[in-house]
Amino acid sequence: VTSSSVLIDAHHHLWDLARRPQHWLDDPALAAIRRTFTPDDLRSTATRRIAGRRLHGTVVVQCVPDVPETEDLLALAEQEPLVGAVVGWADLTSPAIGDVLDELLAGPGGTYLRSLRHLVQGETDPGWLQRPDVERGLTAVLGRGLGYDVLVRSHQLDQAIRLAERFPDLLQVLNHAGKPPIAGREPADWERRVRRLAEHPQVLCKVSGLITEADHGTWTTADIRPVWDVLVGAFGPDRLMFGSDWPVANLAGGWNRWAATVDELLDGWSEHEMHALLAGTATAFYGLRPVTGAADVDTSVTSVPTPNT
């Protein structure tokens, strides 16, 4: 395996409903994904190559605000060769956040914890990320060499911009491109905000979750391309990373259809640019293990130091 043949999925989920309920799946609109999803399910599903690359490794991301779920994902990462890093959850508002993070890092699979995430998209406070208790928690995250996965909706991007301004040393990655309003709504406000966010060099962006922001049944590559072009122009290939958002992506076509779309959108890209988006940027941000036999290709992203974990 060489790095030029490697594909990293920097954003997917796993859940075992027999072990841990996922109450958000009670929404009738999510009935199609209301079942257990395992690493083997992902292996058997994710067969489409992108620019000739096959899936080599992944970053699994928390779903619920629940430390035991994160513990489960870390223990799984320790046993599962496909999973190279975990984006976990801990209560950023808790005075005990430092102790909780230390326990996670010292526990089973703790070395796989590379970033934290909170579903800010569900918070009604327009300044949630600037709350003093949240900022204290983010300082604890930064102090342990971890990154932060920013999950906000388009109208909440101002919070993400303020976060970037106030935490210039905290490595941040915007999830799902800030959820642009692709399905028949004017994306001008999203574009303006995302370009401002991209002015901060410590902020990267996941090209993920776009198809579920489009019309699930009728979207085409043409619907995705305007958002793709904004992201490439704002962040550049070296600060973008591919993610599937599987199995949520199954609501709008699934892993392979999204992969085929990305393959089409990469037409005309250089080898270096494709490697950055498909593997290099995620490898640097999440401190993933380098690929065996890949010493001939630089997998570093100069603007993103590897977290100290």
Give each language-model segment a name.
Residues 27-65, 83-91, 114-118, 146-148:
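Divalent metal-dependent hydrolysis catalytic cores, especially in the metallo-beta-lactamase
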Residues 7-17, 174-177:
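Histidine-centered catalytic micro-motifs
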Residues 2-8, 26, 30, 36-51, ...:
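Mid-to-C-terminal alpha-helical segments outside catalytic/metal-binding sites
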Residues 11, 58, 73, 86, ...:
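Conserved, mostly hydrophobic/aromatic
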Residues 66-155, 162-164, 206-210, 217-218:
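Active-site gating/metal-coordination segments in enzymes
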